[in-house]
Regions:
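Terminal helix/beta-alpha structural elements that buttress the NAD(P)+-binding lobe
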Residues: 1-162
Length: 162
């Protein structure tokens, strides 16, 4: 999600910041993020910056922390994360927190718009792999720990003689 969101935002000439761990920052800069922040060293919610759109793939921040990072018309979009935090964000919206907006995304909506971008190479998937399928248990942990960059891809051996 993050790598596609970056590419789509850059097509619209947006300035895009990325927040992740130190091991990924160099790759994120190479992908085109204008600024990268290591959340272990710096709290982006305390920088005083305001954003028009935040796409969050982890949902580890409180509604209060998130609200202070958005412009008055800013939007916060989450695509996964801790269910307890998601519920708290819904309650924050209903309780009148000024900058919180809830945006529901429908699966596979707008795929027809993305297909030409993918087929022409204007939108490129970022692949972490391929990894052998025998590494599946390790890869599940690797993915769960958030150490991957892009989509984790495994090779599956072909059946011969069938």
């Amino acid at each position: 999600v993050g790598t596609f969101a970056l590419q789509l935002a850059k097509r619209q000439a947006c300035i895009v910041w990325g927040v992740d761990t130190g091991g990924k920052l160099e790759a994120m800069s190479a992908m085109g993020f204008d600024r990268v922040i290591d959340y272990r060293k710096q709290d982006f919610t305390c920088l005083g910056e305001r954003f028009d759109l935040m796409v969050d793939t982890k949902t580890k921040r409180t509604a209060r922390e998130l609200a202070r990072t958005l412009t008055p018309d800013g939007r916060y979009v989450t695509v996964g994360g801790d269910p307890g935090r998601l519920i708290a964000l819904l309650f924050a919206r209903w309780s009148g927190r000024r900058n919180m907006r809830i945006v529901a995304l429908k699966s596979n909506k707008n795929l027809d718009d993305l297909a030409p971008l993918l087929s022409t190479g204007a939108l490129k998937p970022v692949i972490d792999g391929p990894h052998p399928s025998s590494d599946a248990p390790r890869l599940i942990r690797y993915f769960g720990e958030g150490r991957h960059t892009g989509k984790v891809v495994m090779t599956v051996a072909e059946s011969h003689g069938q």
